[in-house]
Amino acid sequence: MLQQWLRQSPAAAGLLRCSRYRGPQAALLQLSPQRAPTYHAIRSLQTSAAESQERIPLRKQLKQGAKGLKAQKRQRRESEEASRQTWELTVGIEIHAQLNTETKLFSRASTSSTDTPNSNVALFDLAFPGSQPEFQAATLLPALRAAIALNCDIQPISRFDRKHYFYQDQPAGYQITQYYEPFARNGYIDLFKHDGIAPEDGDHVRIGIKQVQLEQDTAKSQEYPPSTQLLDFNRVSHPLIEIITMPQIHTPATAAACVRKIQSVLQSCSAVTTGMELGGLRADVNVSIRRRDEAPGTHQYGGIGGLGQRTEIKNLSSFKAVEDAIIAEKNRQIAVLESGGVIEGETRGWTIGSTETRKLRGKEGEVDYRYMPDPDLPPLYIGEDLVSGLRQALPTPPDELIELLAGSDYGLPIEDAKPLIELDDGARLEYYQDVVEILRSLQQDQDAKSRTILARVAGNWVLHEFGGLWTKADLAWDAHRVPPQTLAQIIDQLQRKRITGATAKQVLVMIFDGDRRSLPQLLEEENLLLRPLSREEYIALAETAMSQNPQMVEQIRSKNQLGKLGWFVGQMMRMGEKGRVEAQKADEILRELILGQSGSQP
């Protein structure tokens, strides 16, 4: 390598020459006579044979890496299991969700998040002296929908309080909330295995909801290090609900599942417009630890006693962050207690990708915030007729929809039913149901089993084939791009074996990309209709494929290695005219010729 470098660099070659070579460890470089001779030992530029032999192929490196990760996961599971036997984790969650409203909570300013910073601001939002709050009654409706969907008791009378603290994102020096008398209490949310709860929690967990309260959001801060911070007051006084769960969660995975499920419920009843992924929902988690073999702790929350000292981790913005932050804080508290330390009640932060929480400040209590009734706002009265009307107008809850889709009428696996419900605020589910209804009308005289099969086929196309095109194009969902009628017709043609699966996918892509020809016209003009092969043509293809590998034919005959039939089917499909060879019929002919099994003749 040195010689090559010297050849490519004549100037360097003129300055340097090797005085003499004594092996890799004694290589010396000497300056030319024009300069004073100075000698420096340098590292060998050669690669020894032993080093070259140690190079590991990439595939082997990947395998070793995968094994290492698997071993780490196994060790982590074993460590967590041992930890669970000794320590009890308790978690409570506070979820802050931006409501789906056009105006702010106490002013008529718009809640649009896309406008120019500081353009949607009323005098009260900036706490101008003399400005007064004007409660916007319309903001109550999505809050009520959320509380009803979370099985809460709506309170006929609720009141607003001031929570005092000073920070730059809250110009009034206090936040208006409902600390003492919230508008909703005593709710619950049910979590099931398919929601992602931890295996040790069984098949079902019910988490109590202590209360749901209305409150203001704060300004949006943007930091520009080292010393600049900009504030956008468009978000000040945006209506929020704070959902406070009971401390009844005992595993990190179930905590994340709880936040995910609550977001799904809020979206299903149009209480919110965005979720965690766009900043419309944030979570704070309260974490405490106690030894199982010791007396119950001295702390209590929400009427549940015997808890350890809790810490709060603020502003978690993803489901994974919820789970990871709880794991990190649990491990920190266990380490502190095992070393003889004491857990301090404090507020902590979490950074994505970190393995540790960090202290932000000491934990404030009720006295620190100086809660007091807001003298500028009257009590909030909620009539039973309003609650009853909203309850009747709510859409079907997600759990009931999953039960419907996984039932005998649709027969979808739960892993397909869940995304259909959650994607595109229910628009994907509505599209799917339209496709199924049209497809069933096209495929008349179907028995119950056949109707279920059609629904499952349609689910695969809507969620995976059609859904994959949207994911690849990175576009917002639009049902008009491929209307339900068109997709149902494509599936109908496939079910009637007038087109192949490959052709069906090709046609779907063409229509998705903007081809506006009717389906019959497109199939005819592009020569995509399946022209079935005769029995003789299938036999000719099969015999040709068999002649190419008689040894494999004998293995199928003598050793009953039926899995190798697939190779011959593939050969027949490659040899035949594109799209004309049907795999099922090819398999039937091969079984007849090789094994003497008679099937339905094509």
From Swiss-Prot:
Ranges where the record places region Disordered: 61-83
Coiled-coil positions: none
Highest taxon of the lineage: Eukaryota
GO cellular component, one term: glutamyl-tRNA(Gln) amidotransferase complex
Transit peptide: 1-52
Enzyme class of the recorded protein, top EC level: ligase
This protein's UniProt keywords: ATP-binding, Ligase, Mitochondrion, Nucleotide-binding, Protein biosynthesis, Transit peptide
NCBIfam families per the UniProt record, alphabetical: gatB, PRK05477.1-2
Function recorded in the entry: Allows the formation of correctly charged Gln-tRNA(Gln) through the transamidation of misacylated Glu-tRNA(Gln) in the mitochondria. The reaction takes place in the presence of glutamine and ATP through an activated gamma-phospho-Glu-tRNA(Gln).
Subunit-level organization: Subunit of the heterotrimeric GatCAB amidotransferase (AdT) complex, composed of A, B and C subunits.
UniProt family annotation: Belongs to the GatB/GatE family. GatB subfamily.
Protein name as catalogued: Glutamyl-tRNA(Gln) amidotransferase subunit B, mitochondrial
